[in-house]
Protein backbone atom coordinates (compact mmCIF):
# COMPACT_ATOMS: atom_id res chain seq x y z
CA UNK A 1 0.00 0.00 0.00
CA UNK A 2 1.37 3.38 -0.96
CA UNK A 3 1.68 6.36 1.36
CA UNK A 4 -1.00 8.14 -0.65
CA UNK A 5 -3.44 5.26 -0.15
CA UNK A 6 -2.60 5.09 3.56
CA UNK A 7 -3.21 8.83 3.93
CA UNK A 8 -6.54 8.46 2.12
CA UNK A 9 -7.61 5.61 4.41
CA UNK A 10 -6.63 7.56 7.53
CA UNK A 11 -8.47 10.68 6.36
CA UNK A 12 -11.72 8.80 5.75
CA UNK A 13 -11.43 7.03 9.12
CA UNK A 14 -10.61 10.19 11.07
CA UNK A 15 -13.49 12.05 9.47
CA UNK A 16 -15.98 9.34 10.39
CA UNK A 17 -14.72 9.18 13.98
CA UNK A 18 -14.84 12.99 14.30
CA UNK A 19 -18.46 13.13 13.17
CA UNK A 20 -19.47 10.30 15.51
CA UNK A 21 -17.55 11.89 18.39
CA UNK A 22 -19.22 15.27 17.88
CA UNK A 23 -22.62 13.57 18.09
CA UNK A 24 -21.64 11.37 21.07
CA UNK A 25 -22.23 8.13 19.18
CA UNK A 26 -18.81 6.48 19.26
CA UNK A 27 -20.19 3.37 20.96
CA UNK A 28 -22.82 2.86 18.25
CA UNK A 29 -20.21 3.43 15.55
CA UNK A 30 -17.84 0.95 17.18
CA UNK A 31 -20.59 -1.68 17.33
CA UNK A 32 -21.42 -1.12 13.66
CA UNK A 33 -17.77 -1.31 12.61
CA UNK A 34 -17.20 -4.53 14.58
CA UNK A 35 -20.31 -6.10 13.00
CA UNK A 36 -19.22 -5.14 9.49
CA UNK A 37 -15.66 -6.36 10.09
CA UNK A 38 -17.09 -9.67 11.27
CA UNK A 39 -18.99 -9.86 7.98
CA UNK A 40 -15.76 -9.22 6.10
CA UNK A 41 -14.02 -12.05 7.94
CA UNK A 42 -16.80 -14.62 7.53
CA UNK A 43 -17.60 -13.87 3.87
CA UNK A 44 -14.28 -12.77 2.31
CA UNK A 45 -16.05 -9.58 1.27
CA UNK A 46 -12.72 -7.76 1.06
CA UNK A 47 -11.65 -9.87 -1.91
CA UNK A 48 -14.87 -9.13 -3.78
CA UNK A 49 -14.67 -5.39 -3.16
CA UNK A 50 -11.02 -5.11 -4.18
CA UNK A 51 -11.33 -7.35 -7.24
CA UNK A 52 -11.29 -5.68 -10.64
CA UNK A 53 -13.27 -8.64 -12.03
CA UNK A 54 -16.34 -7.70 -9.96
CA UNK A 55 -18.35 -4.94 -11.67
CA UNK A 56 -19.05 -1.73 -9.75
CA UNK A 57 -22.81 -2.47 -9.85
CA UNK A 58 -22.20 -5.72 -7.96
CA UNK A 59 -20.07 -3.92 -5.38
CA UNK A 60 -22.92 -1.44 -4.86
CA UNK A 61 -25.30 -4.35 -4.22
CA UNK A 62 -22.87 -5.90 -1.73
CA UNK A 63 -22.39 -2.68 0.23
CA UNK A 64 -26.11 -1.93 0.16
CA UNK A 65 -26.59 -5.09 2.20
CA UNK A 66 -24.29 -3.62 4.88
CA UNK A 67 -26.37 -0.45 5.14
CA UNK A 68 -28.78 -2.12 7.54
CA UNK A 69 -26.67 -0.79 10.38
CA UNK A 70 -28.32 1.36 13.04
CA UNK A 71 -25.93 4.28 12.66
CA UNK A 72 -26.85 7.08 10.27
CA UNK A 73 -23.17 8.03 10.18
CA UNK A 74 -22.12 4.56 9.06
CA UNK A 75 -24.76 4.54 6.32
CA UNK A 76 -23.61 7.98 5.13
CA UNK A 77 -20.01 6.75 5.23
CA UNK A 78 -20.86 3.72 3.10
CA UNK A 79 -22.70 5.97 0.62
CA UNK A 80 -19.63 8.19 0.39
CA UNK A 81 -17.39 5.17 -0.20
CA UNK A 82 -19.67 4.02 -3.03
CA UNK A 83 -19.94 7.50 -4.51
CA UNK A 84 -16.15 7.93 -4.60
CA UNK A 85 -15.53 4.32 -5.67
CA UNK A 86 -13.28 3.53 -2.69
CA UNK A 87 -14.75 0.08 -1.96
CA UNK A 88 -11.36 -1.60 -2.25
CA UNK A 89 -10.16 0.31 0.83
CA UNK A 90 -13.22 -0.25 3.03
CA UNK A 91 -11.75 -3.05 5.15
CA UNK A 92 -8.60 -1.05 5.94
CA UNK A 93 -10.71 2.04 6.62
CA UNK A 94 -12.84 0.18 9.15
CA UNK A 95 -9.74 -1.20 10.87
CA UNK A 96 -8.38 2.34 11.06
CA UNK A 97 -11.73 3.58 12.42
CA UNK A 98 -11.38 1.14 15.33
CA UNK A 99 -7.85 2.42 16.00
CA UNK A 100 -9.04 6.03 15.89
CA UNK A 101 -11.93 5.27 18.27
CA UNK A 102 -9.43 3.69 20.68
CA UNK A 103 -7.22 6.78 20.54
CA UNK A 104 -10.11 9.23 21.00
CA UNK A 105 -11.73 7.31 23.85
CA UNK A 106 -8.46 6.00 25.38
CA UNK A 107 -10.10 2.58 25.31
CA UNK A 108 -7.97 -0.19 23.83
CA UNK A 109 -8.52 -3.88 23.20
CA UNK A 110 -6.76 -6.05 25.75
CA UNK A 111 -5.32 -9.36 24.60
CA UNK A 112 -4.64 -11.84 27.39
CA UNK A 113 -2.81 -15.06 26.61
CA UNK A 114 -2.75 -17.67 29.35
CA UNK A 115 -2.19 -21.39 29.67
CA UNK A 116 -5.77 -21.94 30.87
CA UNK A 117 -9.05 -20.07 30.29
CA UNK A 118 -9.57 -17.13 32.68
CA UNK A 119 -12.32 -17.02 35.27
CA UNK A 120 -14.57 -13.96 35.58
CA UNK A 121 -12.66 -12.86 38.70
CA UNK A 122 -9.36 -13.08 36.84
CA UNK A 123 -10.80 -11.08 33.94
CA UNK A 124 -11.86 -8.28 36.29
CA UNK A 125 -8.40 -8.30 37.91
CA UNK A 126 -6.79 -8.07 34.45
CA UNK A 127 -8.95 -5.03 33.68
CA UNK A 128 -7.81 -3.42 36.94
CA UNK A 129 -4.14 -4.14 36.18
CA UNK A 130 -4.53 -2.69 32.69
CA UNK A 131 -6.14 0.47 34.03
CA UNK A 132 -3.37 0.91 36.61
CA UNK A 133 -0.27 -0.11 34.63
CA UNK A 134 -1.17 1.25 31.19
CA UNK A 135 -3.39 4.20 32.21
CA UNK A 136 -6.04 3.21 29.67
CA UNK A 137 -9.59 1.96 29.83
CA UNK A 138 -9.91 -1.68 28.83
CA UNK A 139 -12.06 -2.16 25.76
CA UNK A 140 -12.80 -5.66 24.58
CA UNK A 141 -11.00 -8.42 26.45
CA UNK A 142 -9.65 -10.85 23.87
CA UNK A 143 -8.68 -14.10 25.53
CA UNK A 144 -6.25 -16.59 23.98
CA UNK A 145 -5.23 -19.94 25.44
CA UNK A 146 -1.67 -21.16 24.80
CA UNK A 147 -0.68 -24.24 26.84
CA UNK A 148 3.00 -23.70 25.92
CA UNK A 149 3.11 -20.79 28.40
CA UNK A 150 3.08 -23.44 31.16
CA UNK A 151 1.73 -20.85 33.61
CA UNK A 152 1.35 -17.11 34.06
CA UNK A 153 -0.02 -14.81 31.37
CA UNK A 154 0.82 -12.26 28.70
CA UNK A 155 -1.17 -9.01 28.56
CA UNK A 156 -0.92 -6.91 25.42
CA UNK A 157 -2.47 -3.43 25.19
CA UNK A 158 -1.74 -0.75 22.59
CA UNK A 159 1.64 -2.28 21.62
CA UNK A 160 2.71 -2.63 25.26
CA UNK A 161 3.21 -6.03 26.85
CA UNK A 162 3.38 -7.53 30.34
CA UNK A 163 4.80 -11.06 30.13
CA UNK A 164 4.74 -13.07 33.37
CA UNK A 165 4.69 -16.47 31.68
CA UNK A 166 6.80 -19.30 33.02
CA UNK A 167 7.97 -19.99 29.45
CA UNK A 168 9.57 -16.52 29.27
CA UNK A 169 11.12 -16.92 32.72
CA UNK A 170 12.63 -20.25 31.66
CA UNK A 171 13.98 -18.66 28.49
CA UNK A 172 15.53 -15.82 30.52
CA UNK A 173 17.05 -18.35 32.92
CA UNK A 174 18.48 -20.31 29.98
CA UNK A 175 20.05 -17.13 28.57
CA UNK A 176 21.63 -16.35 31.96
CA UNK A 177 23.26 -19.78 32.06
CA UNK A 178 25.09 -19.21 28.76
Curated annotation (Swiss-Prot):
Q: Report any Pfam family annotated for this entry.
A: OSCP
| Single GO cellular component term | plasma membrane
Keyword Cell membrane found: yes
Q: Where does this one sit in the cell?
A: Cell membrane
One GO MF term on file is: proton-transporting ATP synthase activity, rotational mechanism
Principal subcellular localisation of the protein: membrane
Keywords, sorted A to Z: ATP synthesis, Cell membrane, CF(1), Hydrogen ion transport, Ion transport, Membrane, Transport
Alphabetized InterPro entries for the sequence: ATP_synth_OSCP/delta_N_sf, ATPase_OSCP/dsu
Annotated membrane topology is: Peripheral membrane protein
The organism's superkingdom is given as Bacteria
The Swiss-Prot or TrEMBL record describes its family as follows: Belongs to the ATPase delta chain family.
What does this chain do?
F(1)F(0) ATP synthase produces ATP from ADP in the presence of a proton or sodium gradient. F-type ATPases consist of two structural domains, F(1) containing the extramembraneous catalytic core and F(0) containing the membrane proton channel, linked together by a central stalk and a peripheral stalk. During catalysis, ATP synthesis in the catalytic domain of F(1) is coupled via a rotary mechanism of the central stalk subunits to proton translocation.
Outline the subunit composition: F-type ATPases have 2 components, F(1) - the catalytic core - and F(0) - the membrane proton channel. F(1) has five subunits: alpha(3), beta(3), gamma(1), delta(1), epsilon(1). F(0) has three main subunits: a(1), b(2) and c(10-14). The alpha and beta chains form an alternating ring which encloses part of the gamma chain. F(1) is attached to F(0) by a central stalk formed by the gamma and epsilon chains, while a peripheral stalk is formed by the delta and b chains.
The record's NCBIfam families line, in alphabetical order, gives: ATP_synt_delta, PRK05758.2-1
What is the protein name given in its UniProt record?
A: ATP synthase subunit delta
Q: Which organism is it from?
A: Streptococcus pyogenes serotype M2 (strain MGAS10270)
